[in-house]
């Protein structure tokens, strides 16, 4: 009887520990009338930001970045010539936010954006959306919270 209870307790503890581990990397869902975001915690592992210190962005960080997107997006360098169309449909893009600190101490948000109606995007609140191609349905940009500046716009290539 004691062995059965002990085995049951160990099993329950391992399941609970596993659930906590999964929860520690799941994103927070932050939705407003203007944007729909996943905020990933610093515990989420990603290869996008190498050799940097991670942080979990807060709602004020996201609001500040979204304000910059609305104000500064059209000023970005765009070799694809699709930025005006992207900008016109900003509300239709979901965002994933990842925070990191650069070696010179700047707090930066990596913003992954994708078309909300894309049937191929699943589990966007649990894992980073990564695709090859897809055109302007997929893009990323960085926002420097320290300098209040957007940079490094990347719009995916079309599938050919």
Task: Please report, for each region that a protein language model flagged, where it lies by residue.
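Bacterial Sec-dependent N-terminal signal peptides
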Residues: 1-24
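Generic structural motif
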Residues: 4, 12-15, 116-118, 146-148
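Short, surface-exposed beta-edge/turn micro-motifs
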Residues: 8, 107, 137-138
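Surface-exposed acidic loop/strand-edge motifs in secreted or periplasmic proteins
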Residues: 21-123
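Short consensus segments that form the blades of beta-propeller domains
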Residues: 128-133
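C-terminal partner/receptor-binding element of secreted or periplasmic proteins
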Residues: 134-160
């Amino acid at each position: 009887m004691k062995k059965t209870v002990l085995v049951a307790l160990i099993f329950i503890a391992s399941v609970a520990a596993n659930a906590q581990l999964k929860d520690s990397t799941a994103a927070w869902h932050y939705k407003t009338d203007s944007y729909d975001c996943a905020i990933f915690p610093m515990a989420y592992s990603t290869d996008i930001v190498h050799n940097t210190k991670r942080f979990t962005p807060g709602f004020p960080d996201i609001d500040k970045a979204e304000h910059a997107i609305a104000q500064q997006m059209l000023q970005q360098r765009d070799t694809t010539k699709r930025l005006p169309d992207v900008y016109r449909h900003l509300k239709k893009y979901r965002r994933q936010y990842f925070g990191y600190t650069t070696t010179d101490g700047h707090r930066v948000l990596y913003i992954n954006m994708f078309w909300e109606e894309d049937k191929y995007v699943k589990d966007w609140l649990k894992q980073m959306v990564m695709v090859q191609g897809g055109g302007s349905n997929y893009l990323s940009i960085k926002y420097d919270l320290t300098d209040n500046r957007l940079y490094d716009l990347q719009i995916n290539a079309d599938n050919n």
